[in-house]
Amino acid sequence: MYIVQARPITVLPPEWTLPEKDVIYTKGSLAEHLPNPVTPLFATLGLEIVNRASALLWIDMFGKSAKKLLPENGAYTIINGYVYLSANSKPLLIAVKSLSPRSLRRALTNSVARWETARKEFEDVIKQWEEKPMHMLNAHQIMEGIQTVFYGACIYFTRIQFTLPAASISETLFTKFFQGAARRAGITDTSVLLLGFDTIALQSEKNLWDLSEWAKQNNTLGFYLKSNPATKIAEDFKSSILPAEVSQDVWIEWKSRINAYFKEFGCTAYEFDFAYATPQEILTPTFESIKAFLEEKGENPYLRQIAFEKRRKQAENEILQQIGGHRKKLFLKLLHWAQNTAPMRENAIYLMGMGHPLIRRMLQEISERLLTGGAISHLDDIYWLTKTDWKRS
């Protein structure tokens, strides 16, 4: 027997006081893409824009009921630094039950085309501000650009809320109706029927594979990449000094190819709070992937896709042999619906942070000016300012 003295309690955990009564709070929708405590700038500037865009979505979904649904703080609120989706509890139950057939039908039809339209509109907003010479804009104009692009990101998110349900519902219906036929065909997991499509994420991986194959053809570059950790490669990439192991021509071409990769596939974000660096800034994971391919530790994405496509088509034929007549027509209809919408869902989420690299470049420009003027001590201090502090600076 051991006698152990308990340590005295010196600090009590913070009390989670709810901002409003009779309000439901959940980590759903956009709050899922904000898993960490948000910075003061996002809490006071970003969340205001998020709520403005979300209010339009709620009006679109619930019509006149939206006003009763929305809490005083808006659809999203902060509790102890974390963002939560919120709604007035009693009106929510009534509103969900009274969702119009029109709203449901719109969410389930033409989802891919509507996502492509939302994507194009968001891309146009980004392009408009990317073309502006940032060094010639004053602070007020840059601030306007940050808010415009982020509002575009929020509107894009609200638009895809009317497209993503088609992917999940089509997969659910397909599985429910044909799980028995799949089992009889020896297929235990129907998700095999939705794999192997050329999503943006897969295209990105194939591009990295191509970069590794090109590097193999340049012995000195290949040796350099294998011999150095990804952190060192990232440092050298950002440096103006040429690595001793690689010729200038090869290094210039290497940097050009990497920059082209980031231009095509780096327009995304790890988190929706714009205080977090994007893949274009954190180079290490990209170089780790290339190193894995070079060292033959990573699977060839081209071969993997071919294997998935082969297995998918084989599974389709095996299930078709188990059914006939009207069930076969229904199977093909639901299958094609699920196969059209599943890649769209992945691509839509991938592009949520499409504007974040530009937003962070604009914030960097303002931060450098504040640093030069002595308003802040470090570049990242800008994210710890509130909206009021920011305007005052």
What are these regions (language model features)?
Residues 1:
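Feature captures the catalytic cores and cofactor-binding loops of soluble hydro-lyases/lyases
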Residues 5-393:
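Contiguous hydrophobic, helix-prone segments at protein termini
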